[in-house]
Amino acid sequence: MIIDSKGRRIIPPSARRFMIVTAIAVAIFVVITGVVIFVTRPPTSDSAATFHRGDWQAPPEALLSSPMRVRPVPGWRVRMTDLGLPESAVFADTELTHEAEPFVGAMEKRAYFMAMSTTDPRRWLVGLDLSTGRPLFSPVSIDPGPDFVKCFVNGPDQVLCAADGKPEGKTATIAWVVDTRTGEVVFNGPTDLHVTPGSGSHLKQVGSYVVAEIQGKGLSGVGPRAETTWLIPDAKKVTPTNRNADTAAPRLAVAEDLAGGPDHAVVFSVVDGTVITPDLGADRTPERAVVYPQGFAILAAGKRGSGLRDTVLFFDNAGNRVGESGIQGSLSDLSMVLPMVQSAPSYTVFGANGAGLIQLPGEGLDAVLIGHRLYAPESEWDGPVKVRRWRQFDLRTGEEGTACLPNMQWYIANDGQVGVFETSQHETTGATFFGMDLTTCEKLWTVPVNWESFHRLWRIDDTLVELSDDGKELHSLVAPA
C-alpha cells in the first residue's frame, strides 16, 4: 500500500496482486517479434530434459462462479444489525479508512472478518458462509482493550487472534483461539508469541497456517493454545506471506536456513514443519527457492571450485526433481504461481514441470498472469495520463493476442472470460473497478469508487465480495437476474 502525504490510500489494498518480474538467456529458441518460443530438446547424457509446452497445464484457478460480463449487482447482503452488532460497528480493524484490513482469511467458502466499534474498544470476529452470506456463528467478542489486535487463519478449523500490549515497556500478548466450526473460544490467555515485528517473536500468515519467527531459535508452528509446535532451527524470513492469487495457497513455504550456511534456503511444509530435502546433485547448494501450487523451484549454485554453473531446478511438492532450466539466471520470488527466471534484458516464464513457456524483453515489473494468459506492458508507467499497451500472450501456445489499453495493473479476479480490475484515484478514470473481456480487451463496465471510504473489494474463493463505503455492509457481487 502507498499512502500520500496526507495519509490517504493511493493503491487499493485489494489490488495487492502478484506481479511478474523475471528473465533468462536461452540456448534454443525461435525469435518472433521479440518473443522467444521454446522448442523440445530431448535429454542427453550430460543434461536434464526440457519439456515441450504441450506437457504443461496452467495451475487450477479459483474462478468466480457468477459471470461478470454485465455490471454486477449485490447478491446476499449482511449488515451489522443483521449480526446483532451495534450501529457503531464497522467491518474494520482500525478507524483509519486507508489502513483498514478487515478480511482475516478463508477456508473454501467460509470467510472471516474483523469488526470493531467506532465508539469504544470492542472487537469481534465474524464468520460468513460465502454461498448465502449467513453467519457461521454468532460474532465472537475479542476484547484487547486499547491494544491493536490481529487475527490469522490457522488450519481448516481455527482462527488465532493476538493483541500486543506493553506493560512496563515489555511486550505482553493475549491470544484468542476460535473454533470456526462452532465459534467457541477454545483458548484465551497469555502467549509468548507476538504480532509486533522486532518483539522477539513474530506471527505471520503463511498460506492457510500461522508461522512464528522466533529470534535466536527459528521458525515454529502454532498450536491450539497459541503455543509453539514444530520447530525448524535457525530458519528465518519465511515466504510467501500476504499471498493473493487465483490459485490455491501452496502447502509449502521457503525460509532462509542459517544452519545450512550463508545464502541457503530451506523448503518446508506449513502444515507440520516437515523439511523437504531435494537432491540438487553433487557440489550444489540451494541459494534461493520459490514455491508454487504445483511444486517449487530452487536456484542451485555451484560450490566454489566445482566448475559447475548456477542453474534452476524444478521439483514437485514431494521433492521429486521434474526438470532443469539448463541455463543461468536469477530465480524471481515475485511470482507465486509459475516459476520465473530473470537475466537482463529479458524475463522468462516456466511451467512448474520445467517447461519453458515464453520469454519477453524488458523487466516486466507490472506484467500480470491470469490463468494461461500473460499480459505484459510495453513501457513503464510514467503517470496517470499515459496509456500503455498491454501485450497479451497465450502461454499454452506462445501466440500473441489482442493488445489491451485499460490499466490491468491491479487485478482482482476473473470468471474465465472476463477479468475484474481496480484503478487508483490518481488515474484519469479516478478510483474505479471495472470488467474487461480477457480475449478482446474490451472494457465492459466501470464502477466508480470512493477511495477515502472503507470500501474494499475481494475475491474470496469463487465469490466477489464488496464492503460498502460506510463499512457497515458486506455483500456479494453477482450477475443481474
UniProtKB/Swiss-Prot annotation:
Where is this gene product found? Cell inner membrane
Q: Which GO terms describe its cellular component?
A: plasma membrane
Superkingdom to which the source organism belongs:
Bacteria
Membrane topology listed for this record: Single-pass membrane protein
Q: Extra info from the record?
A: In the well characterized mc(2)155 strain this gene not present; it is part of an MKD8 strain-specific insert (RSR-II) between MSMEG_5168 and MSMEG_5169.
Phylogenetic placement of the source organism: Bacteria, Bacillati, Actinomycetota, Actinomycetes, Mycobacteriales
Q: What is this protein called?
A: Uncharacterized protein D806_5234
Cystine pairs: none
